[in-house]
Each structure stands twice: as structure tokens, then as C-alpha cells.
Amino acid sequence: MDHSMSKKLHDEALLHIVGGVNSPSRSNKGVGGGIPVTMERASGAYFYDVDGNKYIDYLAAFGPIITGHAHPHITEAITKAAQNGVLYGTPTKHEITFAKMLKEAIPSLEKVRFTNSGTEAVMTTIRVARAYTGRDKIIKFAGCYHGHFDLVLVEAGSGPSTLGIPDSAGVTKSTAEEVITVPFNDLASFKEALAVWSDQVAAVLVEPIVGNFGMVAPEDGFLEAVNELAHANGSLVIYDEVITAFRFMYGGAQNYLGVIPDLTAMGKIIGGGLPIGAYGGRIDIMEKVAPLGPAYQAGTHAGNPASILSGIACLEVLQEEGLYERFEKYGSMLKDGIEKAALKHGIAVTVNQIVGALTVYFTEDPVTNYAEAGATNGELFGRFFKGMLEEGINLAPSKYEAWFITSAHSEADILETIQAVDTVFGKMVQDN
């Protein structure tokens, strides 16, 4: 494929934008470098770049675009919002409608509040949990990404009984010491951390199904035990459902798994492609939020009509009968096709697939936590990513990211993708 215009634009972007991108995940650093493709437009399941190349898209903007690009129902809602004014700074009737839709879909959301992003939603749930419990420390799980605010840019110390250390320049040591990080799916480490820090732990923050070191499900009984132990300790449980809400069913991963948290943070899908976040939970906890309580949260753009109307339209599309069954069918088809191609060419892969989301790890071993994901072959994934791009398949440029199937993907798209995988695996073996 010709990418000359993408290269020209990236060279120009480097002169004006830090690193040439507005989020480091777009830089291709995770796949060994190379020029990121600049897209011109998107429609349905397809991307079209500035050089005229067409791609089947599984990036889905890192998750929000579950209905495909430029879905007509969502486009109509956004157009209506633009015509009537995109920002008021006052209440609107639409935010009531949307709040009711979220509550009906995820019953643990007894009250909700809108924010501008998933990062803001997670950040605020932690603040509210601290206000409710009067405690300061947070337990989180290694490799789970919760946004780019200081408190969650923290990695594990030497073990569950040690304090966290900064995972980014600019995060202070004192901030990192408010966080204890333990391995996902490791109940023994979680118990140890809870025992050591006990009455200092305000909340446990967890992705109920991990989406940020690939798609990783909780082991049987893990989330149930986390809930039970946290509550016995007087700590709250916060689910970060920024990736998972409405991903696996019309509702949250908590509905899908049958394990209910005290607070939930959401984003991505619920905006229909526009920036949004939301959080909610038990009434007695949510009443700690201003103006009813002492935990402050605000935002100029929070609940803006454009994002709210886009979100309403997105949820309306997701109510289509049989949609999530189709996601499951296509996800299973992809997993099966990738595994058969890998076996044919003698390439070791593990595919973690949950409904319409999956991750392809270059390893023969199961992946159930961040350390196991980190041990997979990134060099092979980088070659695979670039090979798939040349075959017209757009993936996320990191071995840790997921593929997302949208309502716009067809069975023909899935079959074409499987053929591309077979072709790329063949070339990878030949190149060796």
C-alpha cells in the first residue's frame, strides 16, 4: 500500500504536535515504530486513509464505536444537537432521559452523574469513595488502566504489603503511596494487601473484565471474593466499566457476570463516539456528591446536549434484537479462524475472546494477568500488525489492546479478515 501522504502529514505533525500524535497509543511505538496511518474518513466497518486505502476497522477508536462509524441514527442525533446548540451550561431534559436509560440497563446505578471522560468518571468515584469511608488508600490491579490522572498512574512495589511507586514522570511519591497494586486474578495477594492496609483502604478499583492488557476474564469466584472481602473490611468496590459497559450485553459487565459493585465508572460506548463519562451507584454513597454532599465534582461540558443525544441514540441502536448474539457469533468465528490459521502455519497464539471483543497474544500459554500478557511476543505482534495493515485490516497498534467487532461488521468482513490472518501468518513464516 502507498502511505506517502500519511508520511508527509506525520512529518508535518511532528513540527506542531508533541510526538506527532494527541495520544501516545497512536504513535506505533507499541509495534516497533513506523508511520501511523492518517485517516480521511470512516463509514460503517471501514476506514479510508489520506492515500485512498480502505481498511476493515477493528480499532473502533479504542472501543467507543460499537455501532460502526457514522451510524445514521447517531449522526442524525448529533446533527440535531448542533442545530439546537451544543452547550448550554444549564440542565436539559435529555440528560434525564439518558440517566434513566443507564439506570434501567444497569440497576446498581441508583443515581448517576455525567462527566466529560472515563478518566474523570473514575477519578471522581475514588474521591466519592474516600468521602464516604473517610479513608485514603486504594487497591487496584496491575495492568488495569483507569485513565491518566496521577493516582492511577502507579505501579506495584515489591509485593502486596508495599506501597506503589510512580508509573509516570510528574506523579509524586506521596500520591503513589496512596495506592496498593496487586496482580489481577490473584486472590491471595489481594487478601494480603487488604490485611496489611485494612482500615486505611477506601475502595478496591477493578475492571470486572480487563480490557487494557487485552481481554482477560476474571477467574471463577474472583470478583465475588473481592466483593465479600472488601465489604467485610468496610471498603467500597468500584468497577471501571469504561471499556466494558454495553460491550457484552445491553448493560454492564456486572450484569453479564452477576457481580455488583458499589460504584461504577463508564465512558467510551455510552457517548456514541463523542466525549463522555458517567458514574453512579448506591444512593447513600452518591449523596456525598455536591451539591448534596461534600465531594466536589463539576464540568463545563458535563452533560452537554451533543454528547447526551449521541449517547441516547447509541443505546437505542444497541437495543436491536439479536445484536449481541451476532457479536458472539462473529467473535467466535474470528477466534476459530485465527487459531486454525496459526495451527496451519505453526505459529503459537492464544486468543482471548469475550462476545465481540478479542485479543491475539503471541504465546502458547494462557493469559490471565498482566505479567503473562507482558511475557507475550511483542516483536511478532508488531510484524503481524504491519502485515495486517498491508492486507487492509486496521488493528490497535499494541499487543495489549483488543479487537472490537461493531454492529457494522458483516460475515463477509469476518471471513476476509480470517483470510488476511492466514496470508500474514504465511508471510511471517516465510520471512523467518
Swiss-Prot record:
Its cofactor is pyridoxal 5'-phosphate. Its EC number is 5.4.3.8. It is found in: Cytoplasm. The keyword Cytoplasm applies. Keywords: Cytoplasm, Isomerase, Porphyrin biosynthesis, Pyridoxal phosphate. The modification N6-(pyridoxal phosphate)lysine is found at residue 268. Pfam families: Aminotran_3 (PF00202). Pathway: Porphyrin-containing compound metabolism; protoporphyrin-IX biosynthesis; 5-aminolevulinate from L-glutamyl-tRNA(Glu): step 2/2. It catalyses: (S)-4-amino-5-oxopentanoate = 5-aminolevulinate. It comes from the Bacteria. GO terms for biological process: protoporphyrinogen IX biosynthetic process. One of its GO terms (cellular component) is cytoplasm. Its main location: cytoplasm. One of its GO terms (molecular function) is glutamate-1-semialdehyde 2,1-aminomutase activity. Belongs to the class-III pyridoxal-phosphate-dependent aminotransferase family. HemL subfamily. Homodimer. This is Glutamate-1-semialdehyde 2,1-aminomutase 2. The gene is hemL2.
